[in-house]
Each structure stands twice: as C-alpha cells, then as structure tokens.
C-alpha cells in the first residue's frame, strides 16, 4: 500500500506540473500556440515576449503555485495520515520525488505531447516549500544577475549555482541536496540553446525578441 500511495502522490505531482499554463494563456488571450513563437517555451519569459507583462505575471504565479501544491500535498499526507500507511522515514524522499515530477511535468507536459517550459518557475515553487531561505537566496541571486545583465537565461543558470551552494552550505537533508543537483543539471540542460546563444553573444536581453522565431 505504501508504494501505491507514494506512486499516486508522485503522479499527482507530475500532473500538476503538466498543467500548461502558458499554452492555455496564449490560446485564450491571443489565439496562438506560444510554442510556435519566440523561444518555443511555454514559460513566463516567452509569454512576456509574445503576449505581455500581465500575462507573464499570471503564468509565473500559477507555475509557482502548482509546483508548491505538488510538494504541499505530500507534506499534508504525512501530517494527517498515520505513519503506518507510509513510513515517516520516506517523507523527505517522497517530497523530493514529487517535486522532481512536478518540475519534469512543467517541461514535459503530457497535455502538450511532452513539450513545455524550462522548469525555472516550477523549481522555485518547490524550493519555496522545501526551504524558503534557500528559495529567497536563489531568487536574490537570480534578480541580482538579471539587474546586471538583463538576460533571463543567464540569471536562471546563476540561480542553479546558488541553489546548490545554499543547499550544501546550509547542510540540508541529503534528498534536498540531491534535488538541487538533479534539477539544477536538468534546468541547465533545458537552457542548452540559450547557452549557445550566450557564447555567441546573440542571447536577447529582457524585453528583446529572438532574432529568429523558434530558435
């Protein structure tokens, strides 16, 4: 029973992460598939480029919330149910598995043929529940780099570094540290085309559009 319930909680995490907020926003507000515009991502940055600021704020907020909910549901389970259902020792690991599932769902949504965003907002949403101090430190590093460079992708990668420094520096539980490493590598991989443009000096700054649609 413990394995079945754990699998269900992880599945719920994935399905929550898979809710295609950016895609639905583009469809509702402009009648477009945002995957065919800008960077092709359904995340808030591409929504900002293709639709506008208010839509981007909405998408960012919902993407944060759905990832937070995926983790909160696991924590609530251990709060309201008897440890006999799922061993208490599983808690940190199950929280992290559900968190990773939510992050994966955001970028590989089952509702969008396994396409989606780049999992930055969903990762931050998870961190806000796992450890708000780590989340705020990560957000601070992101905003600091953004203010200096005006490049979202570079700021996101800076945030990845900050997550891992803070997780290990604050001696967080092993599952949380592994979350930082695994998701950090995944988010960096999702930004591989951005990294190429950064090296070429062609990565757009905040407010600019890509020179080539779908790039």
From Swiss-Prot:
InterPro entries assigned to the protein according to its UniProt record, in alphabetical order: G3P_acylTferase_PlsY
Topology in membrane: Multi-pass membrane protein
GO biological process: phospholipid biosynthetic process
Keyword annotations of the record: Cell inner membrane, Cell membrane, Lipid biosynthesis, Lipid metabolism, Membrane, Phospholipid biosynthesis, Phospholipid metabolism, Transferase, Transmembrane, Transmembrane helix
Domain of life: Bacteria
Record-level GO cellular component terms: plasma membrane
Pathway connected to this protein: Lipid metabolism; phospholipid metabolism
Presence of keyword Lipid metabolism: yes
Stretches assigned to coiled coil: none
Catalytic activity: an acyl phosphate + sn-glycerol 3-phosphate = a 1-acyl-sn-glycero-3-phosphate + phosphate
Top EC class for this record: transferase
Membrane-spanning ranges: 1-21, 57-77, 85-105, 126-146, 165-185
EC numbers for this chain: 2.3.1.275
UniProt subcellular location: Cell inner membrane
GO MF annotations in UniProt: acyl-phosphate glycerol-3-phosphate acyltransferase activity
Subunit structure: Probably interacts with PlsX.
Record family assignment: Belongs to the PlsY family.
Role, per record: Catalyzes the transfer of an acyl group from acyl-phosphate (acyl-PO(4)) to glycerol-3-phosphate (G3P) to form lysophosphatidic acid (LPA). This enzyme utilizes acyl-phosphate as fatty acyl donor, but not acyl-CoA or acyl-ACP.
Protein name: Glycerol-3-phosphate acyltransferase
Organism of provenance: Crocosphaera subtropica (strain ATCC 51142 / BH68)
Lineage: Bacteria, Bacillati, Cyanobacteriota, Cyanophyceae, Oscillatoriophycideae
